[in-house]
C-alpha cells in the first residue's frame, strides 16, 4: 500500500481541469499538504517525448492501437519515475488524466476492446488505481467552444477530431461513472470556475479527510 493519496482529474476536451487545478494548488499549500501535480501523457522526459508524438496535429494517420500503446508506454514510465516515488513519500499526487482516459478515448471513442485496455492498464500500473477520481462533465459542444475561444491553448490532434468521437468519449466517462461511482465523483464543469473550484475543493477535502 502506498502512503500517499492519488487523485486523477478526468473529463472531455475543454472541461477546464487544468484551470481548476491551478486554483486549487494555493489552497492545498495553505493547508500544508505536500502535493505533486503532473499530467498524462507526459510528466517525465520520456513521457513528454511520447506526448509530442501522440498529440502532433500532423500525425493524422495514427492507428488507434498505436495511439493506445503509446499512452500505455508513457503511463508506465511516468508511474515508476515520478508518481510512485511521490506516493511513497506520502504526498498527495494529482494527475491530469490517468487510466480512465484510455477507456474513454481509445475504448469508447476509438472502439477498441475495453477488456484489452483494462488488461494493459493493469499491466502498466501493477493494478494501481486512483483513491479518488474527479470527473469534470460538460456538454461536448460547450467544451469544444471553450477550446476554440481560448487563443492561448495549443491545439492538439485530439482537438481536431470530429464531434462524434468527442460524444463517444463523454459517454465512455458516464459509463465509467455508473460502473465505479464509489471512486469517481462527477462535477458539473459548465458552472462558473469559482463554483467548480469550490465543489472540487469540498469533494477533495472530504475524500482526504481534511477539514474544510
From Swiss-Prot:
Q: Which reactions appear under catalytic activity for this entry?
A: dTMP + ATP = dTDP + ADP
Protein residues bound to ATP: 11-18
Q: Which PROSITE patterns match?
A: THYMIDYLATE_KINASE
EC no.?
A: 2.7.4.9
One matching Pfam family is Thymidylate_kin
- Quick one: signal sequence residues? none
**PANTHER family per UniProt:** THYMIDYLATE KINASE, UMP-CMP KINASE 2, MITOCHONDRIAL
Role summary: Phosphorylation of dTMP to form dTDP in both de novo and salvage pathways of dTTP synthesis.
Listed name of the protein: Thymidylate kinase
Question: What is the gene called?
Answer: tmk
